[in-house]
Amino acid sequence: VDPLEIREIGEVIRKVRKERGMRLEDLADEHISPATISNIERGVPHVSKDKVNYVLEKLGLSLDRLPEMMTGEQKKLEDIRLQLAAVESLIDAQETKLAAEKLESLQLEDDHPFAPHFHRLRGKYLIYERKWNRAEKALSNAIRLCEGNSQAERMNVESDAYNLLSLSCYYQNDMAKAVHYTDQGLEAFNPEGERKHVKYVLLRNKGIYLERMGRVVPALRIVDKVWPELGKIDQTETVLSFYWLRSELLRRGGVLDEAMKYAQEGIEFARKNWVWISLFDLWTVLGTIYMDRKDYENAKACFDVVLSLQDKFPEKELFITTYTRIGIMYMNLKEWDQAKPFLDEAIKKGEYMNDVPRLTMALTAMGDYYRLQGNSREALSYYQRVEKLANRHNLKEMEYEAWFRLSQCWKDIDQEEFRRCTEKMFIVQEELDRQKGGVSREMV
């Protein structure tokens, strides 16, 4: 049976069986099992034509009327697919209330061909609403229902559901679990299916999660792997994310000339395509590159562009890194009064967004603000807070940084505390070595 036809035939069989109040077991007999009937209804390919005809005969369905019934079912499927596409557009446009209303009006049963897609969208909507447990339940349902569903396999629903699970973990500051889900999503990806961009979104997100963990080398390996395929990616923002990621990772590795090249190329690409969010990120990294070169005049010029763009974005977590780096720039210039308001604002936004990787960077910078002015006791509370957050969320690079800075503070105050901190540094470094990825200790 043609794979396209089996889907519509299966829908006709499912509809007629349910209209007659029959269970799968009621239709099964010694010649056909409930599992085989379920496969036919779900449009599983490679089902025996004889089995399909046998079920049709058992239901008394006329072969003459079947094309007409299939056309009707195909129209219904197309209508539902359109409604689901509308829901996804509304979610992406942050019109979540209307999206929720449309999802509620659909309420597809689990054996419907689009049920996995429905639950994936429900999970996506709940992530936007920051209802993590309910989102993860919906996405787990989507993944469960993908098994044997040819429509879901063709649409790469399972792969995308894993991507959304990774985002849920990322927003809850569980980077290791987020990376795990991206790996599962990549394993589930169907290269012959639709929505091929999902593969590159998964790779991009995995790179970002590793970057947040301070694991520069494995993140850069992902970027290097994807780079020759950038022309295949049909999402401009995803392409620009790779420009930002490559520039940021090279900067952290000290390869400043190359980092600048990719930042500038990305800025030009983003400008031509009016992608403001990417301009924000790329100007931020370019300003940081100039700061690393101690070219503070150009760094300030870059950050001025970033600050002029900030009103375009509701995503306040974007500002945490930018404000932190501007604060660091002013500290390098010894303009302490200019630095503190930016660091205060970075911490405030990091706390509000519960963005632990960015918050720990801001807190570290504030600790540096006090320590570099000779106020080590005031700095201690910031570094201690970083250590607790980093330890709780398995951010080993940042935990190492916290113990190192704590040891700097205690060195001239309390030798016992100094020794304790250096021992902790050694323990964390051993853990980093086991990870075989945490090579860069620069967090901002």
Placement of each model-derived feature along the sequence:
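Flexible helix-coil transition and linker loops at the boundaries of alpha-helical arrays
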Residues: 72-73, 106-114, 145-157, 188-197, ...
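A short, Lys/Arg-rich alpha-helix, primarily the initiator
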Residues: 1-19
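TPR-repeat structural position
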Residues: 96, 132, 175, 216, ...
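DNA major-groove recognition helix of helix-turn-helix/homeodomain DNA-binding modules
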Residues: 48-66
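Eukaryotic all-alpha helical interaction scaffolds
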Residues: 103, 146, 189-190, 223, ...
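Short alpha-helical DNA-recognition segment
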Residues: 20-39, 342
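Tandem amphipathic alpha-helical repeat scaffolds
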Residues: 80-93, 116-132, 159-173, 198-214, ...
